[in-house]
Every structure is written in C-alpha cells, then in structure tokens.
Amino acid sequence: MIERRKTRAVKVGRVQIGGGAPITVQSMTKCDTRDVPEVLRQIRALEEAGCDIVRVAAPTMEAAECFKEIRKGCNIPLVADVHFDYRIALKVLEAGIDKLRINPGNIGARWKVEEVVRACKDRGVPIRIGVNAGSLEEEFLEKYGYPTADGMVESALKHVAILEELDFHDIVISIKSSRVDQMIEAYRKLSEKVDYPLHVGVTEAGTPFAGTIKSAVGIGTILAEGIGDTIRVSLSTDCVEEVRVGYEILKALGLRTRGINIISCPSCGRVQIDLVKVANEVERRLQHIDVPLNVAVMGCVVNGPGEAAEADVALFGGKGVGMLYVGGERVRKTTEEEMVEALVELVEQKAAEIKASGRVPTGYGRHEER
C-alpha cells in the first residue's frame, strides 16, 4: 500500500485534486483551438476514455474567444493554457473555465497579475503554475548554467510566492522535464517545500513507444513514493492514448482502477496456441469496458491454472482449445478459433452484472465492494 503525501484540496469544477482524492488523469487537445468542432470531438473521445480533466491551449485572443462555445460542449472540467497576455486569461475566465494554467512571472507587470488573480478569486478558479525545463527563466539559467532540478524548484517557488502575496492559495504546481532523472529529482525536492497538490508528468516524452516507457518510469517512480495528485502523460500521438497510458500507470501501482487489467504470459516453447495474437486481440476488443476487471490469457500449465484461478475472467489455452474461467471456476470449453469471441462475451457479461449490482470494484484479484 502506497502512503500518499498529504496535500491541500483544490477543486477543479466538480473534480477535486489533492486532499486525499483519487489521482486524476488529464490530457490536452491537439488541434487548432479555433477549430471548435474538432476540439469538441477530441474532448468527447477523451471523456469516453475516462479523462478527468482536459486542457485546451489559448495562444491568441481569437482562440480565447472560442472557449465559450467549447465550454458549452465540454462535460468534464476545462483548463485553459495561457502565456504572456493577461487579457487572454481574463477572456477565458469569462467563458467559464474551471482552471487556469499560467506562470505569473510571464504575464507581465504586477497589476496584470493582480487582475488575473482577482478574476480567478471571484470565480473560484484555481491556477496551475507550470514550470518546464525547456522554458526556464533566464535568471535561473544564468545562476545554474543550464536547466537543473534546483532551478526548476526555485522557479516554481518564485511563482507560488507571487500568488501567495496576493492571498491566493488555490494552487496546483507542475515541474516538468523531458529528462526523467531530472524530473524525479525536481518533484522530490518540491514536495518537501510545499503542500500544494502536484501535477506530475514527463514533458515532451516523445513517440508512443519511448514516451510511454519514459512516462511510466518517471511518473511511476514519483507516484510510488506517494508524491503526486494528478497526472498527464505527454505523447506525440492521439490524446486518447495518453489517457490509456495514464490509467495503466495508476493500475500498475494499485492507485486507481479503470477498465481491463490484462494478465498474459509472454509465450514460449510450451505454448500450443497463437497466444501473442490472442492476447493482443483480447486487449483491443475490451477497450470499451470501464469496469475494473482482471482478465488472464494464459498458454500453458505452468502458470495458467494459478492465474486463471485468481482472475475475474480467464482463458487457459492449449492444443487448439481453450478453457474459460469465471471467478476461478471453469465454465466453458471452446476452440482456438472461437476463444477470443467467447472470452469477450464472458467479460462483457461480467461487467454488465457488476454495473447492474451497483458494486464498485477496487484493487486486484476478485472485485471487492466499496
């Protein structure tokens, strides 16, 4: 059991970050904000994937003017990402956003920051301070010679101080780097200095394969130490994939469950079915299931029976046939050609039963009532 760090609670619309709330999964739309239909299409896809909070860039006043329409079509908390121009921040706040991502230090004169903070206070909108190694201020680059974890922490604390001086405390902080070791060091150091909730991620992690590994190592390490209240996986791919990877990281640590947890063997000389093909097909076919269930796809007698006994639904294949288990009990025998369809059918039935019963599955192994 991971003991999570205690942080303040910050409300982002109807979703709480910090204060012991479940770790939330975020993503960001990846199109021109002025293309409102496409923005809303991506947001709907993110909602279906389980995204808790979505961020949309507001690089110009023209983009900011689109937020009113985006707000109407968005059913999850909406965050606006603003830099440099305080007027853009005021415009998106008027549109009804739920959180503002800025760095107070790059908004301009103090009176401009005060206007933004006052507008956030009036509307109950929190601010995320987002420090990135790639855009660290010149003063910290001159002090340390290059982006460092210490420089990033100092930058974050500088921005926090600006807001605290204005008696504003609805703050979330992120302190990201594309270097996993640097990101880990920065979050560790920052967590010792503030009790604000932390938004955790590896920025510009890269393409799906390498970026998923970097994110799993970086985000996973920090979460395993009890640090972090919300996460965003940054990948050069469809935003829905970011959400899927985020949930897999949380599931791997037992911090939050959603959808199917696939348990499958890597295959070897003992296996007598095309297990790799079967396991990947099962994963693809079950992406629509949001009820947390453990599904095992095993190919031999060494570990197969044990995993089948522990999983909610399992397939144990051999010699061209498959044995199907539900709750550890064998319920059906099928051919290799039909085993995927049969397994998917049983999983869908199990998920429907759980939803109908009103029970909320948690943790690993058989679902437990909460």
From Swiss-Prot:
InterPro entries: Dihydropteroate_synth-like_sf (IPR011005), IspG_bac (IPR016425), IspG_bac-typ (IPR004588), NO2/SO3_Rdtase_4Fe4S_sf (IPR045854). Belongs to the IspG family. Keywords: 4Fe-4S, Iron, Iron-sulfur, Isoprene biosynthesis, Metal-binding, Oxidoreductase. [4Fe-4S] cluster binds at residues 265, 268, 300, 307. GO terms for biological process: isopentenyl diphosphate biosynthetic process, methylerythritol 4-phosphate pathway; terpenoid biosynthetic process. Pathway: Isoprenoid biosynthesis; isopentenyl diphosphate biosynthesis via DXP pathway; isopentenyl diphosphate from 1-deoxy-D-xylulose 5-phosphate: step 5/6. The keyword Transcription does not apply. The keyword Magnesium does not apply. Converts 2C-methyl-D-erythritol 2,4-cyclodiphosphate (ME-2,4cPP) into 1-hydroxy-2-methyl-2-(E)-butenyl 4-diphosphate. The gene is ispG. Pfam families: GcpE (PF04551). This is 4-hydroxy-3-methylbut-2-en-1-yl diphosphate synthase (flavodoxin). Binds 1 [4Fe-4S] cluster. It comes from Symbiobacterium thermophilum (strain DSM 24528 / JCM 14929 / IAM 14863 / T). The lineage of its organism: Bacteria, Bacillati, Bacillota, Clostridia, Eubacteriales. GO terms for molecular function: 4 iron, 4 sulfur cluster binding; 4-hydroxy-3-methylbut-2-en-1-yl diphosphate synthase activity (ferredoxin); 4-hydroxy-3-methylbut-2-enyl-diphosphate synthase activity (flavodoxin); iron ion binding.
